[in-house]
Amino acid sequence: MKTTRRDATRSRHQRVRRKVVGTAERPRLAVFRSNQHIYAQVIDDAQQHTLAAASTVESDLKSSSGATCDASTAVGKLVAERAIEKGIKAVVFDRGGNLYHGRVKALADAAREAGLEF
């Protein structure tokens, strides 16, 4: 049976997750990318708790096109602002099995510019 793109992304994500673990001091910035939207969460894996989140599904970001680099930039800025409000300055980046390119890279760059360190 042929391996689909989704299956390849899942196996890459499992490989990445073996190496990337978020703690209370340095939580994990997890990115999920679908065809129409992009989601970002700051997660403390020890407590299994989401500390901050943002996505293009939210009403304040819904006006921007969900599947573009501009929308990803807006999500990156918003999740970084929400994390900094909660006192989080450093994170570990989890690209979620996606290549570090395009929308995922735009989100990461925007989060760095907004003040998150990774």
From Swiss-Prot:
The keyword rRNA-binding applies. Keywords: Ribonucleoprotein, Ribosomal protein, RNA-binding, rRNA-binding. It comes from Acaryochloris marina (strain MBIC 11017). GO terms for biological process: translation. Residues 11-20 have a biased composition (Basic residues). GO terms for molecular function: 5S rRNA binding; structural constituent of ribosome. The gene is rplR. Belongs to the universal ribosomal protein uL18 family. It comes from the Bacteria. Part of the 50S ribosomal subunit; part of the 5S rRNA/L5/L18/L25 subcomplex. Contacts the 5S and 23S rRNAs. This is Large ribosomal subunit protein uL18. It holds the Pfam family Ribosomal_L18p.
